[in-house]
């Protein structure tokens, strides 16, 4: 018989981190559409901006599955979508002057340097999310930077946990 590691500590960490990831996803799913809808007063927030190919592909797939019905599109988009729209190249086109509506406690929200740091943190948190989603429990050890990024994002969102 192959010896199995004791998973209880890893599963406890997994559960806590997964819930924190959910907080970020829920907040982004709510705040991004609300913020982008105010730009042109269009309730279909995703029509106001030219996203790169991957986010556009995801939106088109959701609309196709829903037979063109745009209601609730945001609830069907994966975590990767929300991370991708905060890519560094989207700062001036989409987020400059608006990022504080999403992350109200982000220090120096109009700074390009701050935005670049935010984008990197979101990418690292996305990698952490994928490790959890694919049950890479062994890889969850020594993820201190990703956990710090996760907590930074939650604080920047102004969410109390």
Residue ranges: model-predicted function:
Residues 1-161:
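Amphipathic alpha-helical interface elements
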């Amino acid at each position: 018989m192959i010896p199995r590691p004791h998973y209880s500590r890893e599963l406890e960490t997994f559960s806590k981190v997964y819930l924190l990831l959910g907080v970020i996803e829920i907040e982004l799913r709510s705040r991004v559409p609300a913020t982008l809808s105010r730009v042109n007063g269009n309730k279909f927030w995703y029509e106001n901006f030219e996203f790169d190919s991957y986010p556009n592909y995801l939106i088109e797939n959701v609309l196709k599955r829903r037979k063109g019905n745009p209601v609730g599109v945001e609830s069907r988009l994966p975590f990767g979508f929300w991370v991708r729209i905060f890519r560094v190249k989207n700062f001036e086109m989409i987020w400059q002057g608006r990022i504080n509506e999403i992350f109200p406690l982000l220090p120096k929200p109009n700074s390009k340097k701050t935005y670049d740091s935010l984008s990197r943190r979101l990418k690292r948190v996305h990698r952490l999310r994928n490790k959890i989603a694919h049950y890479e429990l062994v890889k969850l050890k020594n993820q201190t930077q990703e956990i710090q990024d996760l907590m930074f994002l939650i604080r920047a969102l102004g969410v109390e946990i």
